[in-house]
Amino acid sequence: LSLTRKLDAANQELIRISSSDSLTGIANRRYFEEALSIEWRRARRHSNPVALLMCDIDFFKLFNDTYGHLAGDDCLRRVAHAISRHSERPSDTVARFGGENFAVILAETSIGGALMVAEKIRHGIGELGIPHVSSPFGQVTLSIGIASAAPGFDNPPDDLILAANKALYRAKQEGRDRICRFDAA
């Protein structure tokens, strides 16, 4: 019986390790993709919208070049924690999408609700006050692209990722430290 408990505990730890980012402690991309797929199917069944925030630390390469990789790692941890803190609902999924990119899945959330969460996150990053002398803003900032969709059988979850990434690209093109929403037109 004791051996069975130890094996169960070890299996649970393996699941936790395989689904979380080792640096930040939040979900990793693999877990994000699985969570989005599950939420997409659930939302389609119940005719609910799903919103996605794609977040990118502005001028992060310059941050690493200026302060070093240890400071960069600390910055990533602090930003991940702040994003998690401002994505408050248990149904929200915060994940490291890659490098300095983070994604937030917001279940049952319209574009308006996603804008409110995104603004809280962006403001929260500003409150961290992490110095960044190589940024025109003087501190670490975040660009956020948002998209929301009502899942159907003809639109896969990858379409939502693509839309949020397009909005993120526009936020960066328009000067960074801002939120842009995806508009299909």
Regions from the PLM with identified roles:
Residues 15-34, 55-69, 77:
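Conserved nucleotide-binding and Mg2+-coordinating catalytic segments in signaling enzymes
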Residues 80-84, 113-131, 163-165:
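Alpha-helical scaffold within the catalytic cores of cyclic-nucleotide enzymes
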Residues 15-16, 29-49, 80-88, 107:
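Short regulatory alpha-helical coupling segments
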Residues 1, 8, 12-15, 33:
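Signal-transmission coiled-coil "S-helix" linker that connects upstream sensory/regulatory modules
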Residues 69, 111-119, 136, 149-185:
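Catalytic-core segments of nucleotide cyclases and related cyclic-nucleotide turnover enzymes
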Residues 93-96:
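A short pre-motif secondary-structure segment
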Residues 51, 143:
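Cell-envelope/extracellular polymer assembly enzymes that use nucleotide-activated donors
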